[in-house]
Every structure is written in structure tokens, then in C-alpha cells.
């Protein structure tokens, strides 16, 4: 889904519709979006393994049920991010193809229901799911709204109402490896960027499509959260105060994830990381110390006491997740790409995000091999150093689609802010250009799903990730074509 959003105008109308239809075809009755469908040979392989395990455990009854469903598609609903990406996808489609309601009103055959259904009804089921999921945080926020804003945003009782990964799971978003969220249970990219973006998309669509028909759909399908919002619409402009409050509330949810470090604290933590991290070789330690932090200050100069201008005010970033105690998991990460592309950052946040992306690893995210997905170097938690290494699937590595999302988001915001903040616009354009140059320099590796880094003389360079990297990219996987989006980067995404 994110790939379709990133590709945007590069995709034809019919291709975009095909992507949405495949999502709607796998939609659960409650509007939950399937992350992946393991169909045909994949589902068959999984069930054969399950069958063999049950036979080994001498369970007689259950294997026969598995054989009955041997070739049935196996839908995976364990992720939470998909539910919030889909409304943005629908919104972008309607914005790009204004006046074309044929897809929304289309009658289709559902393989899950095994009968005909309607796209509009299924889209509204998803919207209801999103609104329902967002309401607990909003209701708690309203109850606490008489207190000072900063105190409210920091309250654990409020943070506990954020969107949590599903019980018993270790992942809930695109970082779907066991430790991809650093052990956290509240995903940063979901709560900071995707929920507000999805609510804004839903509100725009409901204003556009508002009718008695929508209310009928909500009533007939028991979509109570959606119906409440529709009933709150008033005036000729069809506005909903409740929906606007819901959006405003969620736009402030990012405060829970904020990490603020002074210059001295950064120095202390970075020194600790370089000295105590036994996963670093002496060779890599020496390279790190010699890396330029700024033009006239190396990493070793900084940890020995030099204070470059760019760090005098310290730094702020959003943690990769919140742990079970609702404390930020202090890992710098590339998820700000969602913020740039989905228009979910203000000027100050963009300035800080550009700073984080621009400076060299281990101080920030930039390497000669590309933009790092995660960097735990300023965390005092040694476990995070182990969870997010250069060999971890979602660790100190580079993901191709994340690079492209960042590049396209930066170029989009550079154009948008050119007339109001030229200095920031130029910085974003420069950073995007540098990232594109890096990708061009690493050659065919840029088409891999991901790659990692290793120390080489005076920098960290791109190297293939694990085994079989060359076979990870193919045309069936839409993300493999994501770099095509940069053929026309300045259109609104």
C-alpha cells in the first residue's frame, strides 16, 4: 500500500484501482486490512509444515482439518499499520482522479464472503475500524483536557490508549521482525504519522461523499463509530466538530515519543556507545572516531569536548516506539519519511528531521551506503545495540523503499516550502539529491530489498545484506518498482 502511495502519479488509474481492489478483496468483516496473503504454494507449504508438526505431536483430529484447507488462501491480519494506510490510499486516488466515482460505487465479487459486495460499503467498514481504533485515545484526551497540555501529553494513562501492536505479537508495522521496534509495543510511525494522516483522509472523503446513502450503509452494517461522525456533520460546508477534534487530538500524540537530549548528554551517550559496544570491531571504532561530524569537527573531537554549532542546542527526535511502560525507545530512525510524504510535520519538525538525516552515523542516520533505518547509538540500553545491528533485518541497515520515500517526501516538501522558507527548502532538496547520488553510486544493489554497511578505510559503505539479496527484488513485488516514483517527483503525492 505504501508503495502505491509513493509511486503515486506513476501508476495508471487502472493499476491503482487493482491495488485497492486486492486490498478490499482481503478485507475482514470488521474492516481490518490483511498485511499479506500467503496463497497457493505458500499457504500449502505452511499447512504441510503445520500438519507434520501435529502428526509428530500425535494429535489425531486436527491434521484432517488442515488437509481440507490445504489450498485455501491464508490471510494475515497481525499488522496494525495497514488499516491506517488504506484511507490515505483511497484519498490520493480520489484527489488524483477527481469526479470518477465508478470505482467507489463498483459492485465486485468478494473471495472472503464468497458473494457480491460493494466497494463503498467495504471502504466504509475500514473507515469505521480506523475511527473506532482512534476513539479511546481521543476520549481520554478529552477527559484530561482541563489540565495543562504538556502534562496531558505526558500522562501514561493517555499514552496507554495509543494504537498498540496486537497482543502476543512482537511487531505491528513495516518493521515486522521480532525486535524491529526495539522491543516496543506502540509503533512510532503508526501513532505519529499514519493515524493522523488516515483521519484527515477519512474526513476529506466523508465531506466529499456525504449522503443519506452513507448513513444507510453505516446503519445496515453496524458501523456505529462512522455513523456517529456522519450524524455530527452540520452546515452547508458539511463540517464535523467531533472529527476535527479527533484529528487535532491525534496530531499531538507524537509528544509521547519525543526524545530531547542536550549536547553534553549526546556526547556522554555516544562515547559510551563507541567504548562499550562489544559488537563493534576495533577497526570500526577507529573509523567512527575519524568520521566528520561537521566540516571542522570529527566524532573524536566531539566526544573529547568540542561543541560544534549544530549541536549546541542538543537535539530532538521521535523514538522508534514506546515500550510497555509507555516510555520512548530511544532509537533514531528513518520513519520521518512518512511525515515528509504524508504532510504530517510542521516547519520545526522538518528542520530537526533534516538535521538528523543529514549528519553522519553514528551521530545521526547518514552513511556512504545510504540512510539508516535505525540507529541506536544514543541509547543507553545495551539490548538495543544487540537488537538493531548491521545484521538485523530492521537494524542499522538501509531499506530501498524507505530511501525512496524519504527522497520523494523531501522533494515534495522542498517545492511546497520554497516560497515560505527557502533555506529549509534548499536543505531538503540538497539532502534528497545526496541520497539519490548515493543510490546511483551503489549500482544494482539499489534494487535490493535492503542492504547493510561495513567499515572501509574512512567510511561505512554499502554491502549486500545476508544471503540471496540479488533474488529479493522482482516485478511481482510492487516495492521493487518504487524508484520509478522519482521520474516525476514534484507532483503532490
Enumerate the language-model features and the residues they cover:
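Acidic, mature catalytic/reactive cores of soluble proteins
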Residues: 1-493
Amino acid at each position: 500500500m505504501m508503495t502505491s502511495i509513493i509511486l503515486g502519479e506513476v501508476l495508471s488509474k487502472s493499476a491503482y484501482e487493482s491495488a485497492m481492489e486486492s486490498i478490499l478483496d482481503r478485507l475482514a468483516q470488521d474492516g481490518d486490512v490483511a498485511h499479506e496473503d500467503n496463497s497457493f504454494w505458500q499457504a500449502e507449504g505452511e499447512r504441510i509444515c503445520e500438519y507434520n508438526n501435529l502428526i509428530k505431536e500425535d494429535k489425531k483430529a486436527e491434521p484432517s482439518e488442515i488437509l481440507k484447507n490445504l489450498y485455501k488462501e491464508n490471510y494475515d491480519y497481525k499488522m496494525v499499520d495497514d488499516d491506517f494506510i488504506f484511507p490515505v490510499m483511497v484519498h490520493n486516488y480520489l484527489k488524483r482522479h477527481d469526479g470518477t466515482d465508478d470505482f467507489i460505487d463498483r459492485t465486485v465479487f468478494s473471495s472472503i464472503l464468497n458473494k457480491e459486495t460493494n466497494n463503498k460499503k467495504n471502504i466504509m467498514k475500514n473507515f469505521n475500524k480506523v475511527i473506532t481504533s482512534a476513539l479511546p485515545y481521543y476520549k481520554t484526551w478529552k477527559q484530561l483536557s482541563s489540565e495543562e497540555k504538556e502534562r496531558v501529553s505526558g500522562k501514561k494513562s493517555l499514552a496507554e490508549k495509543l494504537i498498540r501492536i496486537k497482543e502476543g505479537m512482537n511487531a505491528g508495522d513495516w518493521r515486522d521482525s521480532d525486535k524491529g521496534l526495539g522491543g516496543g509495543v506502540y509503533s512510532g510511525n503508526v501513532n505519529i504519522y499514519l493515524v493522523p494522516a488516515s483521519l484527515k483522509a477519512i474526513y476529506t472523503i466523508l465531506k466529499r461523499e456525504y449522503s443519506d446513502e452513507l448513513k444507510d450503509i453505516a446503519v445496515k452494517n453496524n458501523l456505529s463509530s462512522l455513523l456517529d461522525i456522519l450524524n455530527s456533520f452540520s452546515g452547508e460546508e458539511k463540517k464535523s466538530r467531533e472529527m476535527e477534534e479527533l484529528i487535532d487530538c491525534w496530531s499531538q500524540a507524537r509528544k509521547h515519543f519525543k526524545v530531547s537530549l542536550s549536547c553534553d548528554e549526546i556526547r556522554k551517550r555516544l562515547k559510551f556507545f563507541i567504548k562499550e559496544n562489544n559488537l563493534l570491531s576495533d577497526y570500526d571504532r577507529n573509523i567512527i572516531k575519524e568520521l566528520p561530524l561537521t566540516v571542522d569537527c570529527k566524532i573524536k573531537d566531539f566526544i573529547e569536548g568540542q561543541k560544534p554549532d549544530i549541536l549546541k542546542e542538543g537535539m530532538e527526535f521521535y523514538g522508534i516506539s514506546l515500550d510497555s511502560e509507555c516510555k520512548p525507545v530511544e532509537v533514531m530512525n528513518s520513519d520521518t519519511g512518512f511525515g515528509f510524504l504524508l504532510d504530517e510535520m510542521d516547519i520545526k519538525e522538518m528542520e530537526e528531521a533534516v538535521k538528523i538525516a543529514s549528519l553522519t552515523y553514528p551521530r545521526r542516520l547518514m552513511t556512504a551506503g545510504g540512510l539508516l533505518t535505525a540507529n541506536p547509538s544514543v541509547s543507553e540500553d545495551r539490548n538495543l545495540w544487540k537488537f538493531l545491528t548491521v545484521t538485523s533485518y530492521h537494524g542499522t541497515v538501509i531499506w530501498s523503499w524507505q530511501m525512496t520515500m524519504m527522497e520523494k517526501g523531501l522533494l515534495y516538501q522542498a517545492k511546497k516550502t520554497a516560497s515560505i522558507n527557502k533555506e529549509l527548502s534548499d536543505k531538503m532538496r540538497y539532502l534528497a539529491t545526496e541520497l539519490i547520488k548515493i543510490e546511483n553510486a551503489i549500482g544494482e544493489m539499489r534494487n535490493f530489498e535492503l542492504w547493510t554497511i561495513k567499515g572501509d578505510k574512512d567510511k561505512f559503505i554499502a554491502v549486500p545484506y545476508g544471503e540471496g539479496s540479488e533474488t529479493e527484488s522482482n516485478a511481482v513485488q510492487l516495492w521493487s518498482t518504487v524508484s520509478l516514483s522519482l521520474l516525476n517527483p514534484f507532483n503532490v503525492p
